[in-house]
């Protein structure tokens, strides 16, 4: 070993460095890399034998360095192993100690649990006893009140009104106490005489039955149902009279009357009540004098209802959301009206009572109204209402489009005047224009032909009793029976039919009539109807005999 050290000290030229914090493999790799680097730097001017010695010395030095690192690491691992073994021994000892102490703690915990259960049972028994004591105290108070009221009644009522029976006298001599009925509750039926007897005796104040005991929640709910809905449109005086009637009927004290008023009012108005109606004055709340009297209750009602805007109240009552309205605009207007009417400017729009009230003002279907009533927020309410509006609009739009498509079908019939589809000849504009431009002389010629045919038919079918000769529609002489008169009448010029002027859009223009025989005299109409009746009777008779009619006129 000494020879190796001398050899290394003589020929080695490397200087190795390593980090003790790194792992052994990393340190060994670093030493080998440094050794190779130093061997590559050996100058070539040395002899080959000298170069080999230097490289070998560097490699031996690297191996010695690795040996030292390995020994140090082995020593470190050995120390850590010893330390771990000591720690394990200490941990095992602590586990043994903890296991021994845990049994003691478990026993202590079980004892504490048993004590807690025992105390809970004792607490339940004490609560039951306390409830029994309270019930007994309440019954005794009612008995005392009934006895005092009865004693006061016996002192004030004369003997003639309530005579004492013989049985009561015997009971008094034997020392037997008379049986007293239990005190009537708040909602037990009382006769008018008994109620008047209680009101006129015992205490001079106006609330004597429930002056020491507060109303229960069920009793308050029953009284509010008796009062009915709080109508904001009524005057404060009428609302006050309704409240005081219930207060006097059930003999409520100031504290109970104020509690009933707070429960009857909407929560926005109840929050505006000031002491001593909204809250008691003084330190004790069980004393009736610390609560508001009848005049103070009336003053508070007038204050919270008198400052409200009647127009705003009417607008809030008449507010409605209908199909086609803007949901955002309706909700914004209703929110502002609600805050003004109920005097709550700091109210959040997500208030459930406000959303429920606004949902009742919407004219929507049942499912949508239910969703609006139980909306979680103001924005959710608006979105639900907007979705319903869009769905109804799309449905209406679909119906209108289908209706338009149905109405867009053309008229299937054809006009025989112009040959076009969509109308009939009666309403044809082309034929109307043709009638307007029809020549007058052709109409006169057609009228003349029709008149001649009519005259010939009347001459052939005139009745035998009449000797008249129809010559012309305007030149008829009823008294002429001779042939000369007939010739003269035939030689007279025929009367021309002049069309009356018809005002159109322009002055100076005339339109011929569509019926050429409008100017036929009335007697000719009557004769024609008589002839038509005779022909009809003749045709009916021939039809009954089975003979065809050959005398039908042909025009």
Curated annotation (Swiss-Prot):
Residues 464-484 have a biased composition (Polar residues). Residues 455-508 are annotated as: Disordered. Pfam families: zf-CCHC. Signal peptide: none annotated. The keyword tRNA-binding does not apply. Keywords: Developmental protein, DNA-binding, Metal-binding, Zinc, Zinc-finger. PROSITE patterns: ZF_CCHC. Coiled coil: none annotated. Residues 485-498 have a biased composition (Basic and acidic residues). Induction: By growth factors such as FGF and TFG-beta. By Wnt-signaling and BMP-signaling. One of its GO terms (molecular function) is DNA binding. SUPFAM superfamilies: Retrovirus zinc finger-like domains (SSF57756). A zinc finger (CCHC-type) spans 413-430. Expressed ubiquitously throughout the embryo at early stages. By mid-gastrula (stage 11), expression is concentrated in the mesoderm and ectoderm surrounding the yolk plug, being strongest in posterior dorsal mesoderm. At stage 13, also expressed at a low level in the pre-cement gland. At mid to late tailbud stages, highly localized in mesoderm and ectoderm derivatives in the extreme posterior of the tail. This protein is expressed exclusively in posterior mesoderm and ectoderm of early embryos suggesting a possible role in organization of anteroposterior axis. This is Posterior protein. The lineage of its organism: Eukaryota, Metazoa, Chordata, Craniata, Vertebrata. The gene is po.
